[in-house]
Regions:
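Active-site beta-loop-alpha junctions enriched in small/polar residues
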Residues: 55-61, 107, 168-170, 232-237, ...
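Bacterial Sec-dependent N-terminal signal peptides
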Residues: 1-4, 8-43
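Substrate-binding cleft and catalytic face of glycoside hydrolase catalytic domains
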Residues: 97-308
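A structural motif corresponding to the C-terminal end of an alpha-helix
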Residues: 98, 151-163, 205-228, 286-301, ...
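Boundary/entry segment of secreted carbohydrate-active catalytic domains
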Residues: 26-101, 105-107
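Aromatic-rich peripheral "rim/lid" segments of glycoside hydrolase catalytic domains that contact
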Residues: 114, 227, 233, 237-277, ...
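Glycoside hydrolase catalytic-domain groove-lining segments
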Residues: 132, 140-159, 276-304, 310-412, ...
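Short, acidic/polar
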Residues: 64-96, 201-209, 313-332, 360, ...
Length: 489
């Protein structure tokens, strides 16, 4: 998962096309992604995966609502911030064509639902909450970003897609005050008992907001399968990159915050306040227990991580998945509830040469032995368009083996991380200038490290267009990644 303003360009890489003819006879065009000449990715893979997803940004900005807060129309109030992709109807149409689920890059993270911009929640009004562990604590009187939940759900509904909720529990992009006395970023860390109570309140509050929105918008009940948010990343990136491969006794050399590279560090530098408070995996088990208590039983609960194919990190993810599934029942909200894990989500930020397909597939098969898998944030770094196209083809040929026709647990969702390069985390600072003529090809014709044959530069134009514009003259080297994915089916 990438942080604010770090959106991948993978989908644009998939949609970058050339003017030559592919082997299956489909015409390769440079048309807009809505054109009939551009095939739908979700339709192409409809017989292989339940869901094809896109990661999108709605934007963090001032909102005003016309009408009821659940069903009304949300617009930019012009007071602060800037709308992004999902806010615009043009992008909603493209998303609807190519995907049946989306993941929001930032909008549902604790940072943006709590909206304590300086890390402090001490000045916000409070109310009393009695948690299932018996702790009675003060909690914020509301989620300051509640309107952002409803605005993004409304935009997804308008786009005709479902959503993977991202994310409930994370070491990063969670306000410092959430972990500290009086919600002050300068306070002492709270006890694990208080933190458990806060954790339950937060998950309960977010999921109840979603449930209220779904009820108001005609989604037919808690256990019916008819949900806009059909899956949640309950915990994100809790394993350390330098995790050890053996765990004995009290040795915790696997969790983020316990290893030499993460211990004692701030979250921005790889540490974890969660681990500082708990010193073990208890908070992870709690998260899946709380999510099971407050989410519909048919909403999928996921553990999500990156570098999941590394030889030392794969066993750490296996370990936590098995611990979640073996977790004991506790009384939550008056009912006996066990932790529930349905999915291991492989972020899949990969390169064209590392990991190898074999290394990735070996990790995938280990995870499938435990649960279903989501490929949750797929993008591929590459040095050229041809290199990227080859990598995409190889990955999709491998992934589809584990789709609907695979016996046992399956890959049920593949999400492509990003739809344009405007704020790419892979190559955010490279600008290319093709000359004086600009032609708008929204979201289609760029790739990770895409290089023109002539070494010319491409740059964004200023003005009112919210999407980049490009001059695609006859020397512009568009790539074949989109057709590689289509043709690998």
């Amino acid at each position: 998962m990438k942080k604010l303003l770090l959106v991948s360009v993978l989908f644009t890489s998939l949609l970058a096309v050339s003017c030559s003819q592919p082997s299956n006879g489909i015409s390769r065009s440079q048309d807009n992604w809505l054109a009939d000449s551009v095939p739908s990715i979700k339709q192409t893979y409809s017989d292989t995966f339940d869901y094809i997803g896109l990661a999108v940004e709605y934007g963090i900005f001032g909102l005003k609502c016309t009408g009821d807060k659940y069903t009304g129309t949300y617009t930019h109030d012009k007071s602060w911030g800037t709308p992004s992709e999902l806010y615009y109807s043009e992008v909603q149409q493209g998303i609807s064509k190519h995907a049946n689920t989306i993941t929001l890059g930032n909008e549902l993270k604790p940072q943006f639902l709590l909206q304590w911009w300086d890390g402090n929640g001490s000045s916000q009004s409070k109310k009393t909450f009695t948690a299932s562990n018996g702790q009675t604590i003060q909690v914020p009187d509301k989620l300051n970003g509640e309107a952002l939940i409803y605005a993004t759900l409304n935009a997804a509904k308008k786009s005709g897609v479902k959503m993977r909720g991202h994310v409930l529990t994370w070491h990063s992009q969670t306000p410092e005050g959430f972990f500290r006395e009086k919600y002050s970023k300068d306070g002492a860390l709270v006890s694990k008992e208080v933190m458990t109570a806060r954790h339950e309140w937060y998950i309960k509050t977010v999921l109840e907001c979603v449930a209220q929105w779904e009820k108001a918008n005609g989604y037919a009940g808690k256990e019916t399968g008819n949900h806009l948010i059909w899956a949640w990343d309950v915990v994100n990136e809790a394993m350390a990159d330098d995790a050890g491969t053996t765990y004995t006794g009290t040795n915790q050399n696997w969790l983020r915050g316990s290893t030499s590279e993460t211990q004692g560090k701030d979250p921005a530098n790889g540490g974890s306040r969660w681990y500082e408070i708990y010193k073990n995996e208890e908070f992870i088990i709690n998260a899946f227990r709380f999510a099971n208590a407050y989410a519909p039983a048919d909403v999928k609960l996921c553990y999500n991580d990156y570098n999941e194919y590394q030889s030392n990190k794969t066993p750490a993810i296996e370990k936590i998945a098995n611990l979640i599934k073996a977790g004991s029942a506790q009384t939550i909200n008056g009912k006996s509830v066990s932790p529930r894990l349905d999915v291991i989500a492989m972020q899949s930020h990969v390169g064209s040469s590392w990991p190898s397909i074999t290394e990735y597939e070996n990790a995938l098969k280990k995870f499938l032995a435990i649960a279903d898998v989501h490929v949750s944030e797929l993008d591929i770094s590459a040095a050229s368009s041809s290199e990227a196209a080859t990598a995409y083809a190889n990955y999709f040929k491998m992934l589809k083996k584990y789709g609907k026709n695979y016996s046992g647990n399956k890959i049920t969702c593949v999400t492509i991380w990003g739809i344009n390069n405007e704020s790419s985390w892979i190559n955010p600072s490279t600008n290319y200038n093709t000359g004086e003529k600009y032609k708008s090809y929204p979201l289609l014709f760029t790739i990770v490290d895409n290089v023109a044959k002539t070494k010319k530069e491409v740059q964004y134009t200023s003005g009112t267009e919210f999407l980049p514009q490009y001059d695609l003259g006859d020397t512009y080297d568009t790539n074949n990644s989109f057709w590689a994915v289509i043709n690998s089916h």
